[in-house]
């Protein structure tokens, strides 16, 4: 094939380059088998051309492809200096010989390996047996593959000449005169090869494989850490392939035309960048001066500003109520510009700040919310005193009646109003959180949205704790109220907090968002989604993400499971499904991936489930679990694709460049 032919010619030129300087100086050249055994070469055809005939270096060779495209290939420096580096190795080995290193295996237990029907038993220095096992018992005849005869002698000068054992780095023993073979009538025989395995541990001898290259002639490969101290059997350090870099070689006029085209494209790109930079200050100046675009989705600027102000006001004042203790439904508000102006007349300064505030990141949005909360708290009294003031201002006709009535009548009226408020309490909470979710939907990424939810949740908890403390003071200023009344009030506030937190954690369904746009009223319960079935192809891949945190010596293990509505979980499921479909893989059963890292400071709710680095590496982790080494194979396929594309390219005059025939080309 074309690539093999090109690589073979390059290797031939490489050997010629190694031999030629020695022959010119009167030396004797030789083919270095050790170099071919221990060095690996890889060819890289680069897309960047060079001007031909400019390099006079001795390590550059000229080759031509099947499409008549010429290349200048530079040999790696490791190939030139390989022999000199080998001569500068460590001094001769002074430790025990190979037979002495293996002698402890004589007293060790025999090694066993089961392959298909047969079980093989190797006893060092004695024999090799083959038999069938059932229920830990030998069934049938026991065959002898051979008895110990001899071992390879590393001190024999004749044996050294073969170089076979040294190149492949193994020690061998010969076993013969075994049971008679039914196929050829000769006794069975076997060769046992011992290789170093540094990862096997102490006494980690094992039979790696059993082969039968010829009838009744066997080869057993045994890996052991006992041979690793010997330099002749220690595996060489793994090294990346030595790259042979090949650049397309162009004629001077072709190369100058290529350089001119590159310069023109660079000038065009620089011109576009300059135009964008010139437009940048104009855009930002319009934003800072408060100039809004004319097209605002069919709505007037006053109306949009009113909506923004209402939304932020709802976020910062969730306890504000309308006259009579009832909240004004969203659909009953006057949507006209005049009504919007009158409704937002008080916080005009706040509204102007919103117009000129530039939100560049989720962190800016969070800081902005905190500023709004702080400013609102400074400009109004505490929550415990706010409601009576509003009632006094909005319902002046009821105040005389309350003053004239007795305290019991007043308490009854307040209880009736509280009951009316409770009916719309859940609906108002869902409406508030729904508006908040809808505003953030187009601003934040899924990961940033989760972090913002957790921070808003923590802020709500702090606010409601203050409410509970103030309520306790109002209910029992002198310590005379009953304990049951105080507990009942705290229970009601805690229930409200739990509802808000639960709604904050849940993600609204698309049907719920459409309801918001039409009526701006959220139903009490979203319709339950149909349970996925195993036959549904969309739900054949299910991912569960669980976070475990080990506490102190007196604390239990904290277990948190990611909700199905979390967008990050949907992203992970899509990633796994795409990977399985593309590679044609099946994950039978369950696959468990553990990511261990130091626990970040903060609460469990505030900490992120997966970091950005974990999400990026999850694909590679999952790929390597299903198919060990498959990720490297995918990278190699991509490299091979680029290599073929560069090899097919035929350089020529401007506009005359083309590619080779895709059908006849094959790597």
UniProtKB/Swiss-Prot annotation:
- PROSITE patterns, alphabetically? MRH
Disulfide topology: 110-123, 181-216, 196-228
Q: Which Gene3D superfamilies match?
A: Mannose-6-phosphate receptor binding domain
- Region annotation (Disordered) ranges: 284-355, 372-452, 464-483, 504-540, 633-667
Q: Recount the PTM note.
A: Intramolecular disulfide bonds.
Subcellular location per UniProt equals:
Endoplasmic reticulum lumen
Where does the UniProt entry place glycosylation sites? Answer: 177
Expressed, tissue-wise, as follows:
Ubiquitously expressed. Found as well in all tumor cell lines analyzed, amplified in sarcomas. Highly expressed in osteosarcoma SJSA-1 and rhabdomyosarcoma Rh30 cell lines.
Segments forming domain MRH: 108-230
Listed GO cellular component terms?
endoplasmic reticulum; endoplasmic reticulum lumen; endoplasmic reticulum membrane; Hrd1p ubiquitin ligase complex
Keywords on record: Disulfide bond, Endoplasmic reticulum, Glycoprotein, Lectin, Signal
Q: Where is the composition biased (Acidic residues)?
A: 413-429
Q: Which residues bind a mannooligosaccharide derivative?
A: 117-118, 130, 182, 188, 212, 218
**GO BP of this protein:** endoplasmic reticulum unfolded protein response; ERAD pathway; negative regulation of retrograde protein transport, ER to cytosol; protein retention in ER lumen; protein targeting; protein ubiquitination; response to endoplasmic reticulum stress; retrograde protein transport, ER to cytosol
Kindly give the Pfam families that the UniProt entry links to this protein.
Answer: PRKCSH
Q: What is its main location?
A: endoplasmic reticulum
| Compositionally biased region (Basic and acidic residues) | 302-311, 396-412, 430-452, 504-513, 633-647
Which region is the signal sequence?
1-25
Name the Gene Ontology molecular function terms of this record.
carbohydrate binding; glycosylation-dependent protein binding; protease binding
Q: What induces it?
A: Up-regulated in response to endoplasmic reticulum stress (at protein level).
Q: Where is the composition biased (Basic residues)?
A: 514-523
Q: Briefly, what is this protein's role?
A: Lectin component of the HRD1 complex, which functions in endoplasmic reticulum (ER) quality control and ER-associated degradation (ERAD). Specifically recognizes and binds improperly folded glycoproteins as well as hyperglycosylated proteins, retain them in the ER, and transfers them to the ubiquitination machinery and promote their degradation. Possible targets include TRPV4 as well as hyperglycosylated HSP90B1.
Q: How does it assemble?
A: Component of the HRD1 complex, which comprises at least SYNV1/HRD1, DERL1/2, FAM8A1, HERPUD1/HERP, OS9, SEL1L and UBE2J1. FAM8A1 is stabilized by interaction with SYNV1, which prevents its proteasomal degradation. OS9 and UBE2J1 recruitment to the complex may be mediated by SEL1L. Through this complex, may interact with ERLEC1 and HSPA5. Interacts (via C-terminus) with CPNE6 (via second C2 domain); this interaction occurs in a calcium-dependent manner in vitro. Interacts with CREB3.
What PANTHER family does this protein's entry cite?
Answer: OS-9-RELATED (PTHR15414), PROTEIN OS-9 (PTHR15414:SF5)
Regarding protein family, the annotation reads: Belongs to the OS-9 family.
Give the protein name, as stated in the record: Protein OS-9
Q: Which organism is it from?
A: Homo sapiens (Human)
């Amino acid at each position: 094939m074309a690539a093999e032919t090109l690589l073979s010619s390059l290797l031939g030129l490489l050997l010629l380059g190694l031999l030629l300087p020695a022959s010119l100086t009167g030396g004797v050249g030789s083919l270095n088998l050790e170099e071919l055994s221990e060095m690996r070469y890889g060819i890289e055809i680069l897309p960047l051309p060079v001007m031909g005939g400019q390099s006079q270096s001795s390590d550059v060779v000229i080759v031509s492809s099947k499409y008549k495209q010429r290349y200048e290939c530079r040999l790696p420096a490791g190939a030139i200096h390989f022999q000199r580096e080998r001569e500068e190795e460590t001094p001769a080995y002074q430790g025990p010989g190979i037979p002495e290193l293996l002698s402890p295996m004589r007293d060790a237990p025999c090694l066993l390996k089961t392959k298909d029907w047969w079980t093989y038993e190797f006893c060092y220095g004695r024999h090799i047996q083959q038999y069938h096992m059932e229920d830990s018992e030998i069934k049938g005849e026991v065959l002898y593959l051979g008895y110990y005869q001899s071992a390879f002698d590393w001190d024999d000068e004749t044996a050294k000449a073969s170089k076979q054992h040294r190149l492949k780095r193994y020690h061998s023993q010969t076993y013969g005169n075994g049971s008679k073979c039914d196929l050829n009538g000769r006794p069975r025989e076997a060769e046992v090869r011992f290789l170093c395995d540094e990862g096997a541990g102490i006494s980690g001898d094992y039979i790696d494989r059993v082969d039968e290259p010829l009838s009744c002639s066997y080869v057993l490969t045994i890996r052991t850490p006992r041979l690793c101290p010997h330099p002749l059997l220690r595996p060489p350090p793994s090294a990346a392939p030595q790259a042979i870099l090949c650049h397309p070689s162009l004629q001077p006029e072709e190369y100058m035309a290529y350089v001119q085209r590159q310069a023109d494209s660079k000038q065009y790109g620089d011109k576009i960048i300059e135009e964008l930079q010139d437009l940048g200050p104009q855009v930002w100046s319009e934003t800072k001066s408060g100039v809004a675009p004319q097209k605002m989705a069919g709505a007037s600027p006053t109306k949009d500003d009113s909506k923004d102000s209402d939304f932020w006001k709802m976020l910062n004042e969730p306890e504000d109520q309308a006259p009579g203790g009832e909240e004004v439904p969203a659909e009953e508000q006057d949507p006209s510009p005049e009504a919007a102006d009158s409704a937002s007349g008080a916080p005009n300064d706040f509204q102007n700040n919103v117009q000129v505030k530039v939100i560049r990141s989720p962190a800016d949005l969070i800081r902005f919310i905190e500023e709004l909360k702080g400013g609102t708290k400074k400009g109004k009294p505490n929550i415990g005193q706010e409601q009576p003031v509003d009632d006094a201002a909005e319902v002046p006709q009821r105040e005389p009646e309350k003053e004239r009535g007795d305290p019991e009548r007043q308490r009854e009226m307040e209880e009736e109003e509280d009951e009316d408020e409770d009916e719309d309490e859940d609906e108002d909470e869902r409406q508030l959180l729904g508006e908040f979710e809808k505003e953030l939907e187009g601003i934040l990424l899924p990961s940033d949205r989760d972090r913002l939810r957790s921070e808003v949740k923590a802020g709500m908890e702090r606010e409601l704790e203050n409410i509970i403390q103030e309520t306790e003071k109002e209910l029992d200023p002198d310590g005379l109220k009953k304990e049951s009344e105080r507990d009942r009030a705290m229970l009601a506030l805690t229930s409200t907090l739990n509802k808000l937190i639960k709604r904050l954690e849940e993600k609204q369904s698309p049907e719920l968002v459409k309801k918001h746009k039409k009526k701006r009223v959220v139903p009490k319960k979203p319709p339950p989604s149909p349970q996925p079935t195993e036959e549904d192809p969309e739900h054949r891949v299910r991912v569960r993400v669980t976070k475990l945190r080990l506490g102190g010596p007196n604390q239990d293990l904290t277990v948190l499971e990611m909700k199905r509505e979390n967008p990050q979980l949907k992203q992970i499921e899509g990633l796994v499904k795409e990977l399985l479909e593309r590679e044609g893989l099946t994950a039978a059963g369950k696959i468990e991936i553990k990511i261990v890292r130091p626990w970040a400071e903060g609460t469990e709710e505030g900490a992120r489930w997966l970091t950005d680095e974990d999400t990026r590496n999850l694909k590679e982790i999952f790929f390597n679990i299903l198919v060990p080494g498959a990720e490297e194979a995918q990278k190699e396929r991509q490299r091979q694709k680029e290599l073929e594309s560069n090899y097919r390219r035929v350089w020529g005059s401007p506009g005359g460049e083309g590619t080779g025939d895709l059908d006849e080309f094959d790597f």
